[in-house]
Amino acid sequence: MDYRSAGVDVAAGRAFVEQIRPLVQRTQRPEVVGGLGGFAGLCQIPKGYRQPLLVSGTDGVGTKLKLAQALDRHNTVGIDLVAMCVNDVLTCGAEPLFFLDYIACGRLAPEMMNAVVAGIAQGCEAAGCALLGGETAEMPGFYAEGVYDLAGFCVGVVEQDQVLDGTQVQVGDVVLGLASSGLHSNGFSLVRKIVSDRQLSWQDTPLGPTSLGELCLEPTRIYVQPIRAALSQGIPIHGMAHITGGGLPENLPRCLGQGRSAHLDPQAWPIPPLFHWLGEVGNVSLGELFNTFNMGIGYTVVLPASAVAAAQTCFAKWGIESWPIGTVVAGAGEVLGLPAA
């Protein structure tokens, strides 16, 4: 009897590390010290920071993984994993420095795991952060064969006097909504229930030539480069929110600071057809849709009205549509103007 007969192949794990080494190397930044395979990853703080603060965030992809595994498509969920972490770190104005991943699986399937890590590396490249290290845990008897879970961890850096913490937000500021790429990585338990209860197929094409499964697996948009570009241009951003689980009502107030709310106009941006379709087919109220999904707004920027045009021009250069979707008002941390659940 040996470890391999118990379901853990240490040799396959070592081979996997060698296979992904080129993917990891593509993401490296000048600040990274050493290479892949050590007990820990090392990274310097970039030169030029006066009073650097380290910023950390961790997240997963949720049950979107169930869909990826059902469709045997594994090359995009790694992008989702990075996006969920770096977009969070970005909200306080930080520059993402490095990323760590944790993959747990029933059996290490090299082709599948290579696809996952390729997506993680692609996400890191898009965010400008190094894939500094990770852990792949083979857990037979805990996860079924073909099943895996992902978790990510990101560290960024920001000047202490440039942290966006809500105190800069003022009544009268505009809420600028940046377009999402689709569902992103939230609400998939409801999506899967709708598809299951209505006896639909992920291969169905209710909204055009692209299958429902492909629409839902569209990776989460990474907003790092356009936001960093806006900040470097001196656009006076007062606050930012990553619109994830709980939608706009749950996430927008987190960047407004004390004594402020937001009044939004749900007619101010085009809600993508996928969200309307989910509401109609699943008999989900518009209010519940807003409380569950991003509804086409994946990230919000709060800034003075005088800066809106410059910000929209900046984001458009990165291929991202944006709309003034509301204003900041005095209040107790609420989002007003959206349909009730």
Curated annotation (Swiss-Prot):
It is found in: Cytoplasm. This is Phosphoribosylformylglycinamidine cyclo-ligase. InterPro entries: PurM-like_C_dom, PurM-like_C_sf, PurM-like_N, PurM-like_N_sf, PurM_cligase. Its main location: cytoplasm. It comes from the Bacteria. One of its GO terms (molecular function) is phosphoribosylformylglycinamidine cyclo-ligase activity. GO terms for cellular component: cytosol.
